[in-house]
Regions:
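FNR/FR-type flavoprotein reductase catalytic core
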Residues: 80-163
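Ferredoxin-reductase
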Residues: 2-90
Length: 163
């Protein structure tokens, strides 16, 4: 396996999907196309600009567009590092290492994917990669839902909430 190196990704877009939940599209340089190496279920380590936070933040990959050298991350603001990322705008850069992790091994045939809360985003890349019938069960705390519409073209979607 090739050694992963740190590179600078450029923010292409960022939006708030739900309170505290952000969608971030990153573009990668042609000479180190992280998107071409990524597969569903992997994650990226994002580094803060602030030297006081030495450890990177692991964020799962939501969507992969290898042809455009882009990856979409959907994350929850949970501390100072992710709060910093939520303020990034188009054209800003973020230091990234990845893709990391083993990822999923897609198989043909019927698939049932189950995810809740911030565990939902990696299900989108997986659902898009599967052949055959796909059903997705999503769990949310309340009626504020994210990524349901994104998953609908690729799977039958079922939702459960705590409220």
């Amino acid at each position: 396996m090739a050694e992963k190196k740190k590179c600078l990704a450029t923010v292409k877009s960022q939006s708030e999907l739900a309170p505290g939940i952000y969608s971030l599209w990153l573009a990668f340089p042609e000479e180190y196309n992280v998107a071409a190496m990524a597969k569903p279920g992997q994650f990226l380590s994002l580094y803060s600009d602030d030297g006081s936070r030495l450890l990177p933040r692991p964020i799962s990959i939501c969507e992969i567009d290898a042809a455009k050298r882009m990856i979409r991350l959907v994350y929850r603001v949970a501390g100072a590092g992710t709060l910093e990322f939520s303020g990034k705008q188009e054209g800003d850069t973020i230091a990234v290492v990845g893709p990391l992790g083993n990822g999923f091994t897609p198989r043909s045939g019927k698939s049932i994917l189950i995810g809740g809360g911030i565990g939902i985003p990696p299900m989108l890349a997986l659902a898009k990669s599967l052949s055959g019938e796909v059903q997705v069960v999503l769990g949310y705390r309340d009626a504020v839902q994210f990524l349901k519409e994104d998953l609908a073209p690729y799977a039958s979607v079922y939702v459960s909430t705590e409220d």
